[in-house]
Amino acid sequence: MKDKILKIVRTTKETDISAELKIYGEGRCEIATGVGFFDHMLEAFGKHALLDMKISCKGDTHVDFHHSVEDVGIVIGTLLKEAIYPVSGIERFGDSVVVMDEAAVSCALDLSNRAFLVYENFNEKGKVGEFDIELAEEFFRAVSMNANITLHIAKLRGRNNHHIIEAAFKSFAVALRRALAKNPRVNTPSTKGVL
């Protein structure tokens, strides 16, 4: 586990991203992706996971928000992977159910060094502001694949797209915070002896 500020710069023809992450922070975030609703979600994620994050993304938002959202997920996942592995002295597993008014979303995750995403019961279409709601799944997939975490997120109920997506980000945040909780009785939390 790396309890320090990690930094990354990632530049492609579609996005130019610089980011900093500290996994044992206070939830302080400076987010500027050019996608207002996504900034709001990342701030909520950082706040409830107690991550300190700085993210600056200049993307081809004149085309679509997809590249910016996915690439920010890649960057966050890459930083999480660097910070987390090898796993030692933490809980490893985390889960959470977060409600926001009529919406409820569950998240269970395993800092297993095995990438997998289950994203269930999100059948909504449309946008929140200018944000296509299916981009939330692209973000979670990019994070899980690049952080090598097993991530299950499921909508339990909800009608308002804003509430549903925000509950998903917050549920992921709380589950991650719980999985990262330090436990001095745990060395490597695996019967294999390594993750």
From Swiss-Prot:
CDD domains: IGPD (cd07914). Coiled coil: none annotated. It catalyses: D-erythro-1-(imidazol-4-yl)glycerol 3-phosphate = 3-(imidazol-4-yl)-2-oxopropyl phosphate + H2O. Pfam families: IGPD. It is an enzyme of class 4 (lyase). Pathway: Amino-acid biosynthesis; L-histidine biosynthesis; L-histidine from 5-phospho-alpha-D-ribose 1-diphosphate: step 6/9. One of its GO terms (cellular component) is cytoplasm. The keyword Lyase applies. GO terms for molecular function: imidazoleglycerol-phosphate dehydratase activity. The keyword Amino-acid biosynthesis applies. Belongs to the imidazoleglycerol-phosphate dehydratase family. HAMAP family: HisB. PANTHER family: IMIDAZOLEGLYCEROL-PHOSPHATE DEHYDRATASE, IMIDAZOLEGLYCEROL-PHOSPHATE DEHYDRATASE HIS7. This is Imidazoleglycerol-phosphate dehydratase.
